[in-house]
Amino acid sequence: MEQFLAVGKIINTHGIKGEIKVMPSTDNVERFKELNEAYIDGNIVEIEGCKFQPGKVILKIKGIDSIEDAQRLKNKYIKVSRENAATLDEDCYYEADIVGCTVYDENEKQLGNIDEIIHTGSNDVYWIKGPNELLIPAIKSVIVDIDVNNKKIIIKPLEVWQ
């Protein structure tokens, strides 16, 4: 399993004092308030400040004090170590643990691997790449079992729900 988990992607600078604008990839943006340290490119960084905009988080990182410094971080990911990650509810998983899983139907037919998770308004959708590309809704009526330790997901046969 991944040692570090992405909690957001740096999408732009904010202001002229080195703040960065982050698109959160966590469903609980309030966790950023308690974030004292994170990782960017495997290097630990100290978080000095946090504020919110609709759908975005603005962070101030120690040592990043100019717009030029902040610009160099654009398109990088803010990550936390797994042991410092938020505790998940039952039947909830980190994206890093889902992406790469092999998907099978209940008849043990291999359908492909999860390449990406698409966030929609109502539920996530797993983008499966294999012999055919598939979009699988991440809902209980379709997903039978998720085993992140063995990187295996079982779904109902396509003809049942498609």
UniProtKB/Swiss-Prot annotation:
Listed A to Z, the keywords are: Chaperone, Cytoplasm, Ribosome biogenesis, rRNA processing
GO molecular function (one): ribosome binding
Enumerate the subcellular locations listed in this protein's record, separating them with semicolons.
Cytoplasm
Checking Pfam families in the record gives: PRC_RimM, RimM
This entry carries the following GO cellular component terms, namely:
cytoplasm; ribosome
Determine if Cytoplasm is one of this entry's keywords: yes
Q: Which residues form the PRC barrel domain?
A: 90-161
Top-rank taxon: Bacteria
- Primary subcellular site in the record, as a coarse category: cytoplasm
**Which GO biological process categories is it annotated with?**
ribosomal small subunit biogenesis; rRNA processing
InterPro entries in the record: PRC_barrel-like_sf, PRC_RimM, RimM, RimM_N, RimM_N_sf, Transl_B-barrel_sf
The task this protein performs is described as: An accessory protein needed during the final step in the assembly of 30S ribosomal subunit, possibly for assembly of the head region. Essential for efficient processing of 16S rRNA. May be needed both before and after RbfA during the maturation of 16S rRNA. It has affinity for free ribosomal 30S subunits but not for 70S ribosomes.
Domain characteristics, as noted in the entry: The PRC barrel domain binds ribosomal protein uS19.
User: Subunit comment for this entry?
Assistant: Binds ribosomal protein uS19.
State the similarity comment. Answer: Belongs to the RimM family.
Listed name of the protein: Ribosome maturation factor RimM
Q: Which gene encodes it?
A: rimM
